[in-house]
Curated annotation (Swiss-Prot):
Protein name in the entry: Large ribosomal subunit protein uL6
Gene3D superfamilies: Ribosomal protein L6, alpha-beta domain
GO CC terms, sorted: cytosolic large ribosomal subunit
Organism this protein belongs to: Xanthomonas oryzae pv. oryzae (strain KACC10331 / KXO85)
InterPro entries: Ribosomal_uL6-like (IPR000702), Ribosomal_uL6-like_a/b-dom_sf (IPR036789), Ribosomal_uL6_a/b-dom (IPR020040), Ribosomal_uL6_bac-type (IPR019906), Ribosomal_uL6_CS (IPR002358)
GO molecular function, a single term: rRNA binding
Gene that this sequence comes from: rplF
Function summary: This protein binds to the 23S rRNA, and is important in its secondary structure. It is located near the subunit interface in the base of the L7/L12 stalk, and near the tRNA binding site of the peptidyltransferase center.
NCBIfam families linked: L6_bact (TIGR03654)
Keyword annotations of the record: Ribonucleoprotein, Ribosomal protein, RNA-binding, rRNA-binding
Pfam families to which the protein is assigned, alphabetical: Ribosomal_L6
Length: 175
């Protein structure tokens, strides 16, 4: 079995793991997440610890993946995930209009982004966007979609970038 799959998933207080024949659901203070249960992977719950095992040798590889996804689901419903974006550039601004995000990114019109269900958007400052949610994959997808509106360009670094992202700069053309 893979090294990742051998490691048990600990369930913090307030998190409930429910395994059915076709579905695995994790319920916690931040919401409920579900995962279709792959065939050949067994999930055993012993108190506040869940362990995974493969029934079939061909399913050993997927067991580690399922364990990692399950651990992310447990962390998501207990603590949640967040991704911070920064707007770099003159006149680049973000503001909330109700639950929608309005972005001024140098286009002739403001972009309005509607947050999908389960994702919370906020703007601590005019040049910062905070994407929060219980599902790690959806938080990353939404952050990537917002970043895709105006990815950072390599000459001046203007655009929407992840917090802490290093933009490799190019030198301007010499005359």
């Amino acid at each position: 079995m893979s090294r990742v799959a051998k490691k048990p998933v600990s369930l913090p207080k307030g998190v409930e793991l429910n395994v059915q024949s076709e579905l695995v659901s994790v319920k916690g203070p931040k919401g409920t997440l579900t995962l279709p249960k792959p065939t050949g992977v067994e999930i055993a719950i012993d108190g506040d610890v869940a362990t995974l095992s493969a029934n079939d040798p061909s399913q050993i590889a997927i067991t580690g993946t399922v364990r990692a996804i399950l651990a992310n689901m447990v962390k998501g419903v207990s603590e949640g995930f967040e991704r911070k974006l920064e707007l770099v550039g003159v006149g680049y601004r973000a503001a909330m209009q109700g639950k929608d995000l309005s972005l001024a990114l140098g286009f002739s019109h403001p972009l309005v982004f509607v947050a999908p269900e389960g994702i919370t958007l906020s703007t601590p400052t005019q040049t910062e966007i905070l994407v929060q949610g219980a599902d790690k994959q959806r938080v990353g997808e939404v952050a990537a979609k917002i970043r895709g509106f105006r990815p950072p360009e390599p000459y001046k670094g203007k655009g929407v970038k992840y917090a802490g992202e290093v933009i490799i700069r190019k030198e301007a053309k010499k005359a």
